Regions:
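Conserved catalytic-site region of short-chain dehydrogenase/reductase
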Residues: 78, 113-127, 142-148, 160, ...
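Active-site Tyr-X1-5-Lys
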Residues: 140-171, 194-200
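NAD(P)H-binding glycine-rich loop region in Rossmannoid oxidoreductase-like domains
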Residues: 49-93, 105
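Short-chain dehydrogenase/reductase
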Residues: 89, 93, 139-151, 183-191, ...
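Flexible, glycine-rich beta-alpha linker
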Residues: 120-121, 142, 166-188, 213
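Conserved Rossmann-fold NAD(P)-dependent oxidoreductase catalytic core, especially the SDR/UDP-sugar
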Residues: 97-140, 166
Length: 322
């Protein structure tokens, strides 16, 4: 039996990965997260609640597992990265140190690190290939730097100690599971925008000109990609862009969300707020490597995925107001 430790398994992407693993009887799943695991997860998985920054807790969580998928990190929207730069750098680095050491100590068969598209914050090649990570200038944001540091940690642990690693870089994750925050920019853009539209905001506020581009990737597609990379012999010591392929402007994404919330297309209007010091102008990855080596590609279209997310969030917000 393949026993997989999913760190950060109670998060939005983590929960999608756990659901994907539980759908395959060949996987036994252990989740480690300081957040409360939902009931379905507690009923289906072994749940560990220790602080993985502590080496003894990371070791306890990893013991008996053959595979690790490392998602535990401080994440969020662009405002969160600017609000907590030292905290997220410190926490994420401590997690790398303890969790990777535990993986080495317990001789896991595969350590899969879930990185971020933010390592390509200053990319100059489009569509951006995995190989471009070595030519891309160092990220300016603390978050981008911290996720790049995790990739360096994996490769260093392999070079010195033989860590069997795989790196996955999700791009612009969205889907049911993430609630918006009262402060704009703390959560990711999609739940933030859905909440604004459902609340009746008009004109709809976005950060920046709206010409910035993103590649929205549904969490279920990301989960499939991460598990495919972890499971495949071809994924060993490789890195993969885990992303949809359609490049959309933020303004186009806002319009898709507006119409998915049943607002009149003729009334669509944007208000442009000042953007942040670091805001990625363009994000468009090359996804051919994952398709070629793993047989994986994103399957959920943006209109379908956004409609699903709107329905989920509408139900949660209605329940909260009841």
């Amino acid at each position: 039996m393949t026993r997989v430790l999913v760190t950060g398994g109670a998060g939005t992407i983590g929960a999608a990965v756990v659901r994907r693993l539980l759908g395959d009887p060949s996987f036994d799943v252990r989740v480690s997260d300081q957040r409360a695991a939902p009931q379905w997860m507690r009923e289906s998985c072994e749940v560990h609640t220790g602080d993985l920054r502590l080496h003894e807790q990371a070791s306890e969580a990893t013991k008996g597992c053959t595979h690790v998928i490392h998602l535990a990190a401080i994440v969020g929207g662009i405002a969160n990265f600017h609000k907590l730069p030292h905290t997220l750098t410190s926490v994420n680095s401590a997690l790398y140190d303890a969790v990777i050491q535990a993986a080495l100590d317990h001789d896991v068969e595969r350590f899969t690190y879930v990185s971020s598209s933010m390592v390509f914050e200053r990319a100059t090649e489009y569509p951006t290939t995995e190989e471009h990570v070595f030519q891309t200038p160092m990220p300016r944001s603390a978050y981008g730097f911290s996720k790049m540091a995790g990739e360096v940690w994996c490769r260093a642990a392999h070079d010195e100690h033989g860590l069997p690693y795989t790196i996955c870089r999700p791009f612009n994750a969205y889907g049911p599971g993430e609630m918006p925050d009262d402060e704009p920019g703390i959560a990711h853009a999609v739940p933030d925008l859905i909440r604004k539209v459902l609340s009746g905001q008009h004109p709809l506020q976005i950060f920046g000109s709206g010409a910035q581009t993103r590649t929205l990737t549904h969490i279920d597609d990301i989960a499939d990609g991460v598990v495919a990379a972890m499971s495949s012999p071809a994924g060993l010591h490789e890195d993969f862009n885990i992303s949809a392929s359609e490049e959309l402007t933020v303004a186009e994404i806002a319009r898709i969300i507006w119409e998915a919330c049943d607002r009149d297309p003729a009334e669509f209007e944007l208000e442009h707020l000042p953007t942040f010091t670091v805001d990625v102008v363009r994000r468009w990855p090359d996804v051919s490597k994952a398709k070629r080596m793993l047989g994986w590609e994103a399957r959920i279209g943006v209109h379908e995925g956004v409609a699903q997310t709107v329905q989920w969030l509408r139900e949660r917000l209605a329940a909260a107001d009841a």
